[in-house]
A protein has these predicted regions:
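Charged low-complexity intrinsically disordered patches
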Residues: 105-129
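Eukaryotic partner-binding/assembly regions in large regulatory complexes
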Residues: 1-8
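Feature primarily recognizes SF3-like P-loop helicase cores of small DNA viruses
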Residues: 10-13, 33
Length: 129
């Protein structure tokens, strides 16, 4: 999970969830996208081996707070997760220590595709302007 990037489409600005979020909730929203696994990863969850799929991750409220910053409280994070569930952005399954978060429709928005390079394609000439 340490490397890579995520896609954030401009259409997000028109999304009702985004429009109804506070600045703090938007920080949490983007942070959750950044925390999600981009490929399968093995975890132990509720005492059992679990394979986290792309768009899922195991975390805690405290861990989210460490990533978003101390200015955002655990209560704000908890309320944001509840709001994100109502808007069907994510699902959150918690135990007394950890929480499995699944970003809904992850594959639809974050599917791997060819990454553009600075190199010209074979059917296009390079120019020196």
């Amino acid at each position: 999970m340490a490397g890579g990037w995520i896609k954030v489409h401009r259409k997000l600005l028109e999304n009702s969830l985004w429009e109804n979020c506070t600045a703090e909730q938007k920080v949490i929203f983007i942070t959750l996208l950044l925390m999600a696994n981009h490929e399968e990863k093995e975890w132990i969850f509720k005492g059992e081996k679990y394979i986290c799929k792309p768009g899922q991750f195991v975390t805690s409220l405290k861990s989210i707070q460490e990533k978003v910053g101390k200015d955002i409280s655990i209560m704000q994070i908890r309320r944001s997760l509840e709001k994100f569930e109502v808007y069907q952005f994510l699902t959150s399954e918690s135990t007394n220590k950890n929480r499995l978060i699944t970003i809904e429709n992850w594959g639809l928005y974050q599917e791997k595709e060819d990454v553009p390079t600075d190199k010209p394609t074979s059917n296009r000439q390079a120019t020196d302007n």
